[in-house]
Structures are given as structure tokens and as C-alpha cells.
């Protein structure tokens, strides 16, 4: 490990690895570090991604594909089922990944592009001089190193310390985080061609339960519950998950379990400062509705890698330059989608089970493989006129997209 690089990327998840690869492909000298000894472990998500969007960032490799989904089924509190084609099911439906293999493959691609990759290497603080981030203090195999870099990219996940060290407020309130629990189960009779989502305040308060098949009778079964609905004297997310498992898959065997948190806060005020950018969960760039963050992280990582090249080439890594080449571009694209999702989240967390059932009944007969904006408007108007009004900004935005696509 050298003491000077162009770019230091802290965290080797999808965001960090894509950022490192992108910067290295541009000819920059890059160090990518991961605090754990094994990249991709532990897994902390349902592992589902949209096929078309994934192909934008990486060539598909069957080694890290567990299942190929064609649809999703959403179940209302009363059991009403809504079927949606894969293309309309959002960023988390399409392929089910083996994240332990996938994340490692992304890091390998970064290494092949020229980045240096170091595991069991933890950042313990930033080097800050004259109000500029100049690198980080690292701990590797019991030895401390001061590593300098022209730009530091913080990709250290939901528990990020990098942003806080740099003076960026990444704090989360209980309502801004989903508390999650997930089991990998085996021995269950699970359809391997679609995933399932279960909603309802008795099932997962202000959240949902997911079932993602992983082949050979295995599946990820997990739950996310809004942090404001957990705490002292309240059931834990794992309690809701255990109850669901007992009812839905009584013969299943739990072979692995993971716990964690997912940011659902929407965009934070600031994701860059002099000499530093935040990406992925560290920048709170996950989807506020689903908590899904793989594709958003890869998108942000690519933008950050390109921004690092632009800033270093210009000899200017100031906040003003990083706002120009990273902050403004990501907010105009990815950030816009996150903001729209936050509007939906804030509407739906206030719906009662009766409201959710009414909405499901209105959507039950809709053919989602060819649904139009007008179809959705009519269904929402029938179910809940107030909900339609609350979401009006989304439809105004969607209508603009329809017009743009037709011209």
C-alpha cells in the first residue's frame, strides 16, 4: 500500500467498486479498501435487481444469478393479490443475485481496471488540512497508515462515518430508517419465477415483507419496518417475520440470518465537500419506498468515478467543483427519482389497512403488463381521491415524460 493515490474509495460494496473501476478506467491511481476480510459478506438485502438497469453497469454473469423472475405479486392485508410484470415491478425485481459472488466480482472488475484493492483495511479518520480532505488514516492488519489522496470517496454504507468525519450531516431519525431482518430459508415450496411482497400494519408496520426465490427450494424472506414503529414495548421486526414464517412456510428451515438498517430518508442536503464525495447508502441514495439501493449505488458510483476524473484533470477538487461535476448531476437524475419516491412513501405510511385493501381492490383487475398512466389514475380515483391528490405531483411529472417520449 502506497502513501499517495489519486482516489481513495472507502467501502467495497457496489457503489465503491463501481466508483473505483470507473476512476481506474479513466487512468487514475485508485485504492479501494474494505473493512471486512471478505467482500460481499454479510449480505444485507433481498438481492433483487432490475435486469435492464443492471446491464447498464455490468456484463451479466450467470455465476451470480440465483433466479430469473418474470413477475411480482403484491398482497394486501386481506390477501388480495396484485400481479405485476417484471418490467413494471421497480428496481428490485428481475434477477435475484448471489451478493457474496456479485460484490466480489465487481471488486475484481475494479482490480482488473487497475485499482488496488485491500480487504481488512478500516478507515479510522480523515486527514483534513486547510478545510480540504486530503486522505484517510487506515488500519490494516494491526498497523496504521496515513494514505493521502486527491479525492476521497465515502462508500461505507448506512453506518457511514466518513461523512460525519468530514462535517456532513448524514444522521437519520427513526422515521428515516427501515429496521430489517432476513432469513435464507430452505426446504420450502416456493415458486421460482416471481417474488412476493406482503403489506399491512399487522404484517409489517409502515413496511413490508418480501420473498425472493434463490433456486433449489431456497428463498430470502425478510422484513423492513419503519424505525418509528419499533422500540420499547413494541414487537421487533424479527417477531413479525417469525409469525409470518410460521404461517406461510411452516416446514421451512432457516439456514442463514442477517439484520440491519436501510436508509429511506430521501436525499440529504449535502453529499460532497472539499476533496470528498459520498455515494450509495453513505449518501442516503437508496429508494425511500423499497429501501432498495444496489442500482442506485452503482449509478452514483459511476457518476462519482467520472466526477473524480473531471475534477482531478481540472486540478480543482473544491466543493464548488464537486458540486458541478457530481452533486448537481446526481441530484438532477437519481436524486429526482429519490425525491419522487419519498413523496409516495410519505403518503403510503399513513394509509390504514382498510385504505390498502381498497387500493388493492381497485388495482386487482388492472393488466399491469400494459397499464397506462390513465389506467392508474382511474384506479386511484376509485380507491382514494385524497391519495390521488397527495400524489398529484408524480402524475404531473409522469405526464411530462409521456409527452417527451412521444415527441
From Swiss-Prot:
Its cofactor is FAD. Binds 1 FAD per subunit. Its EC number is 1.3.7.11. SUPFAM superfamilies: FAD/NAD(P)-binding domain (SSF51905). The keyword Signal does not apply. Pathway: Membrane lipid metabolism; glycerophospholipid metabolism. Pfam families: FAD_binding_3, GGR_cat. GO terms for cellular component: membrane. Reduction reaction proceeds via syn addition of hydrogen for double bonds. Belongs to the geranylgeranyl reductase family. DGGGPL reductase subfamily. This is Digeranylgeranylglycerophospholipid reductase. The lineage of its organism: Archaea, Methanobacteriati, Methanobacteriota, Stenosarchaea group, Methanomicrobia.
Amino acid at each position: 500500500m502506497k502513501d499517495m493515490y489519486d482516489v481513495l474509495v472507502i467501502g467495497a460494496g457496489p457503489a465503491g467498486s463501481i466508483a473505483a473501476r470507473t476512476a481506474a478506467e479513466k487512468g487514475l491511481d485508485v485504492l479501494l479498501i474494505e473493512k471486512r476480510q471478505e467482500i460481499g459478506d454479510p449480505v444485507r438485502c433481498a438481492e433483487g435487481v432490475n435486469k435492464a438497469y443492471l446491464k447498464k453497469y455490468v456484463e451479466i454473469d450467470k455465476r451470480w444469478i440465483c433466479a430469473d423472475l418474470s413477475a411480482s405479486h403484491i398482497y394486501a392485508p386481506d390477501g388480495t393479490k396484485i400481479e405485476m410484470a417484471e418490467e413494471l415491478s421497480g428496481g428490485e425485481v428481475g434477477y435475484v443475485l448471489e451478493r457474496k459472488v456479485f460484490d466480489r466480482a465487481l471488486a475484481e472488475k475494479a482490480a482488473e481496471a487497475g485499482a488496488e484493492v485491500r480487504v481488512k483495511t478500516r478507515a479510522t479518520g480523515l486527514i483534513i488540512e486547510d478545510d480540504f480532505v486530503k486522505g484517510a488514516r487506515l488500519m490494516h492488519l494491526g498497523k496504521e497508515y496515513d494514505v493521502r489522496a486527491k479525492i476521497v470517496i465515502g462508500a461505507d454504507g448506512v453506518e457511514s462515518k466518513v461523512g460525519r468525519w468530514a462535517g456532513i450531516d448524514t444522521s437519520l431519525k427513526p422515521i428515516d430508517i427501515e429496521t430489517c431482518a432476513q432469513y435464507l430459508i430452505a426446504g420450502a415450496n416456493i415458486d421460482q419465477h416471481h417474488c412476493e411482497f406482503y403489506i399491512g400494519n399487522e404484517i409489517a408496520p409502515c413496511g413490508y415483507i418480501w420473498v425472493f426465490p434463490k433456486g433449489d427450494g431456497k428463498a430470502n424472506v425478510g422484513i423492513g419496518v419503519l424505525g418509528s414503529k419499533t422500540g420499547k414495548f413494541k414487537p421487533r421486526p424479527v417477531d413479525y417475520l417469525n409469525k409470518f414464517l410460521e404461517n406461510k412456510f411452516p416446514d421451512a428451515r432457516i439456514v442463514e440470518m442477517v439484520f440491519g438498517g436501510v436508509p429511506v430518508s430521501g436525499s440529504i442536503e449535502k453529499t460532497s465537500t472539499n476533496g470528498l464525495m459520498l455515494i450509495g447508502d453513505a449518501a442516503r441514495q437508496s429508494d425511500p419506498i423499497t429501501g432498495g439501493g444496489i442500482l442506485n449505488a452503482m449509478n452514483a458510483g459511476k457518476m462519482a468515478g467520472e466526477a473524480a476524473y473531471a475534477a482531478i484533470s481540472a486540478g480543482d477538487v473544491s466543493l464548488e467543483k464537486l458540486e458541478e461535476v457530481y452533486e448537481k448531476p446526481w441530484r438532477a437524475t437519481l436524486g429526482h427519482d429519490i425525491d419522487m419516491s419519498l413523496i409516495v412513501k410519505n403518503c403510503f405510511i399513513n394509509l390504514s389497512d382498510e385504505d390498502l385493501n381498497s387500493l388493492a381492490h381497485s388495482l386487482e383487475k388492472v393488466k399491469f403488463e400494459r397499464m397506462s398512466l390513465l389506467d392508474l389514475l382511474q384506479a386511484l380515483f376509485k380507491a382514494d381521491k385524497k391519495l390521488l391528490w397527495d400524489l398529484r405531483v408524480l402524475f404531473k411529472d409522469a405526464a411530462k415524460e409521456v409527452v417527451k417520449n412521444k415527441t
